[in-house]
Swiss-Prot record:
The name this protein goes by in its record: PKHD-type hydroxylase Dtpsy_0528
Coiled coil residues, start to end: none
Residues of the Fe2OG dioxygenase domain: 78-178
Organism: Acidovorax ebreus (strain TPSY) (Diaphorobacter sp. (strain TPSY))
InterPro entries: Oxoglu/Fe-dep_dioxygenase_dom, PKHD_C, PKHD_hydroxylase, Pro_4_hyd_alph, Pro_4_hyd_alph_FE2OG_OXY
Residue stretches spanning the membrane: none
Source domain of life: Bacteria
BP terms from Gene Ontology: DNA damage response; intracellular iron ion homeostasis
EC number from the UniProt entry: 1.14.11.-
Length: 227
């Protein structure tokens, strides 16, 4: 399941983040790649331990906590602190699958990566190339969203970033461990929750159909969630 979420950040917020990121020192992104991914990764990143990365990452986390579509789709248990990357001058990231387990920064605690997220911080017309291509059961989906919009996709997916031939593609990226590990179960819960949300304004709050559907959702979540 690949889900686009509009306006996680406002245009004003994007401009503020970009002003700070554009003035920052960028490092070779290959230094943070795994052994196999290192050979296909050509981009730049902000140092994860920098005050800037941590402060901007916290801002994104606050926005995610008030984004209902993200909560519904991801059912987040743990979110890896957001990172920032930049692709320019032919920068690209070849086909790879994200690591299944990651240590949270500054701790010995591991998290499982169920979902990967890219939050776009550059408008599509600012750069050529730079599409996020995600392989799924129905073929390859190319994603290039407006600044402030975000895409969620399974971390198990083979994916790549095509070469940027003009301008710069700037984004934040991170991973989510979900309360519901199984992708099929998580998709069913998301579809059911979205149906409930669409039905809610059309019927009375005590409508038996709405009450029953809501009960089904929570009982399935109770069965499948692993807090």
């Amino acid at each position: 399941m690949l889900i686009s979420i509009d306006q996680v950040l406002s245009k004003t917020e994007v401009r503020d983040l970009r002003a700070q990121l554009d003035a920052a020192a960028w490092e070779d992104g290959a230094a943070t790649a795994g052994t196999l991914a290192k050979s296909v990764k050509r981009n730049q990143q902000i140092n994860d331990g920098s005050e800037l990365c941590q402060r901007l990452g916290q801002h994104i986390l606050r926005r995610l906590s008030s984004t209902p579509l993200f909560i519904s789709a991801a059912l987040p248990r743990t979110i890896y602190p957001p990172k920032f990357n930049r692709y320019a001058d032919g920068g690209t990231y070849g086909a790879h699958v994200d690591s299944a387990l990651m240590f949270l920064p500054g701790s010995h605690q591991q998290m499982r990566t169920d979902l990967s997220a890219t939050l776009f911080l550059a408008e599509p017309e600012e750069y050529d190339g730079g599409e996020l291509e995600v392989e799924g059961p129905f073929g390859v989906q190319a994603v290039k969203l407006a600044a402030g919009d975000m895409v969620l996709y399974p971390s198990s997916s083979l994916h790549r970033v095509t070469p940027v031939t003009r301008g710069a593609r700037v984004a934040s990226f991170f991973w989510i461990e979900s309360l519901v590990q199984d992708e099929g179960e998580r998709t069913l819960l998301f579809d059911l929750d979205q149906s409930i949300q669409q039905l809610t304004p059309l019927v009375a709050p005590d409508d038996p159909r709405l009450v029953q559907l809501t009960g089904v959702y929570h009982n399935l979540l109770r069965r499948w969630a692993r807090p």
